[in-house]
């Protein structure tokens, strides 16, 4: 089983619309580990680890997000996996 790590930066109307909570729920459904947090500049940052197909599914979902979100851009970067996470959670 191949484990990858993706770093995602989501911009648009993504704070105050349950984007973090929805991302956490979606990532857990996909069996991913990592975290999601709001950034001071209004973006949402995500670090997720898991199988490539599940990471791709999360990346695709991030372009839509929850119902009230308006996503302008999702920047993705693949990084070496560290497998340091045991679950997926919202951080501050």
UniProtKB/Swiss-Prot annotation:
Chain ranges of the Acylphosphatase-like domain: 5-92
Gene3D superfamilies: 3.30.70.100
Keyword S-adenosyl-L-methionine: no
Keyword terms of this UniProt record: Hydrolase
EC class: hydrolase
Keyword Hydrolase: yes
PROSITE patterns cross-referenced by the UniProt entry: ACYLPHOSPHATASE_2, ACYLPHOSPHATASE_3
Active site per UniProt: 20, 38
Spans traversing the lipid bilayer: none
One MF term in the entry's GO annotations: acylphosphatase activity
This enzyme's EC code(s): 3.6.1.7
Catalyzed reactions: an acyl phosphate + H2O = a carboxylate + phosphate + H(+)
Top-level taxon of origin: Bacteria
Family to which the UniProt record says this protein belongs: Belongs to the acylphosphatase family.
Entry protein name: Acylphosphatase
Lineage: Bacteria, Pseudomonadati, Pseudomonadota, Gammaproteobacteria, Pseudomonadales
